[in-house]
């Protein structure tokens, strides 16, 4: 009896705690201040980056300062951009190897789990590259090709319902059902790796219960192969001495990889800023603007996008369908890694503020305009902190705010940006 009373007491406490915890969770989801703070932090970071560029652009730079700034660009090209894309290529290959050409009767949970782990590794590296989308990623439309969202589930269902086991190049052209987000849908549900049983039978997602897992595996194989080619394209586009095997894959796929004006690499292009016969950047300042503060494809560009689109569209504007990475629950991680891409560029290495690079914007501003530099660095740290403080998962946060289930949210068409 005593034991029963003790257990009952524990049960009562557990129920009370569970209810209290559930209430607290709901209250947090209903609290708009978290999203507002994250958007405000991104706005401050964008402003700080613009101020930093203006400080350089308006300065009467000495020759020593110009040399240091060029060294910073060289460091960013080699140690941030090329290295990020190389590691991204490695992770994409890992994902491809995990799934391979396995059929539904051959695949194991280990295959799925390994593919999911490689997906998250690749996803982190891709999000860590979004501060430097200016260049190959935008010139060759690689960014929209491998990272368009929301996923067009209706169109994807049409493809999968056709029962195809292979896909032509022409059929792999609609970016709304390709890249990371198509793979995310196939590999993850409700923030969890999918169970192998689904791939051996039928999907369980609303509207997809007539789709066989083996059909999804065949489609995933085609999408991964396409993704691998395009991340290789990013890598060899920036390398002055490209990896021979990856270059061959890019050439075999008929993909572009050189700057049109000079037929040189994008790394070479950045390193020769100011030499109009060797670079698309007529001045050193123009190259720095592209890295730090252009409205698109720069550090400021991705800070703006995170605050005014990735967070604002679903959270502030009510377009719940616009949540990025909703199936893996990776949204907040994606947003924070976007800001970390800015951090890597600013500090000149893959480890953010711990990079200790020989040349970096961090060191340049510490020596020449410390208040401006500190403003950027504080804004980076604050943006990451405010983003990571938002209720997890972001898709549930937005769904609660607007009382709309993600799977029921209708796609909203946005005008294409010029």
Task: Put a short name on every predicted segment.
Residues 2-9:
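Sec-dependent signal peptide recognition
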Residues 20-23:
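Bacterial signal peptide processing site
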Residues 1-2, 31:
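Short, intrinsically disordered low-complexity segments
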Residues 25-418:
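Mature extracytoplasmic or organellar-lumen-exposed domains after removal of signal/transit peptides
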Residues 10-13, 93:
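N-terminal or membrane-proximal amphipathic helix/coiled-coil initiation segments that transition from
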Residues 15-18:
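C-terminal motif of bacterial Sec signal peptides marking the signal peptidase cleavage site
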Residues 9-10, 44:
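Acidic/proline-rich low-complexity IDRs
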């Amino acid at each position: 009896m005593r034991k029963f009373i003790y257990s009952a007491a524990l049960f009562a406490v557990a129920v009370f705690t569970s209810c209290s915890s559930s209430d607290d969770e709901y209250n947090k989801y209903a609290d708009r201040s978290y999203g507002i703070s994250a958007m405000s932090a991104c706005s401050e970071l964008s402003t700080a980056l613009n101020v930093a560029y203006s400080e350089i652009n308006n300065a009467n730079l000495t020759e020593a300062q110009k040399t240091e700034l060029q060294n910073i660009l060289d460091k960013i090209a080699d140690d941030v951009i090329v290295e990020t894309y190389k590691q991204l290529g490695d992770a994409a290959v890992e994902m491809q190897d995990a799934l391979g050409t396995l059929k539904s009767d051959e695949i194991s949970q280990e295959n799925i789990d390994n593919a999911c782990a490689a997906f998250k590794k690749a996803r982190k590296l891709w999000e860590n590259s979004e501060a430097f989308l200016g260049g190959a990623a935008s010139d060759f439309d690689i960014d929209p090709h491998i990272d368009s969202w929301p996923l067009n589930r209706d169109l994807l269902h049409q493809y999968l319902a056709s029962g195809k086991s292979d896909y032509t190049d022409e059929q792999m052209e609609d970016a709304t059902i390709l890249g990371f987000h198509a793979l995310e849908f196939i590999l993850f549900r409700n923030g969890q790796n999918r169970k192998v049983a689904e791939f051996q039978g039928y999907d369980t997602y609303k509207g997809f219960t007539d789709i066989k897992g083996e059909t999804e595996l065949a489609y995933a194989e085609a999408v991964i192969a396409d993704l691998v080619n395009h991340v290789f394209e990013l890598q060899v586009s920036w390398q002055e001495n490209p990896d021979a095997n990856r270059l061959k894959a890019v050439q075999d796929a008929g993909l572009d990889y050189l700057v049109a004006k000079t037929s040189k690499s994008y790394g070479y292009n950045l390193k020769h800023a100011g030499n109009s016969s060797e670079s698309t950047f007529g001045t050193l300042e123009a190259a720095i603007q592209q890295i730090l503060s252009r409205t698109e494809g720069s550090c400021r560009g991705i800070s703006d996008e995170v605050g005014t689109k990735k967070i604002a569209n679903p959270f502030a504007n009510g377009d719940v369908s616009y949540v990025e990475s909703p199936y893996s629950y990776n949204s907040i991680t994606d947003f924070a890694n976007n800001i970390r891409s800015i951090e890597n560029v600013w500090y000149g290495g893959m480890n953010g503020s711990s990079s200790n690079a020989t040349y970096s914007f961090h060191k340049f501003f510490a020596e020449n305009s410390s208040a401006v530099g500190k403003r950027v660095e504080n804004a980076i740290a604050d943006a990451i902190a405010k983003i990571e403080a938002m209720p997890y998962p972001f898709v549930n946060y937005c769904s609660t705010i607007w009382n709309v289930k993600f799977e029921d949210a209708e796609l909203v068409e946005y005008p294409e940006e010029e």
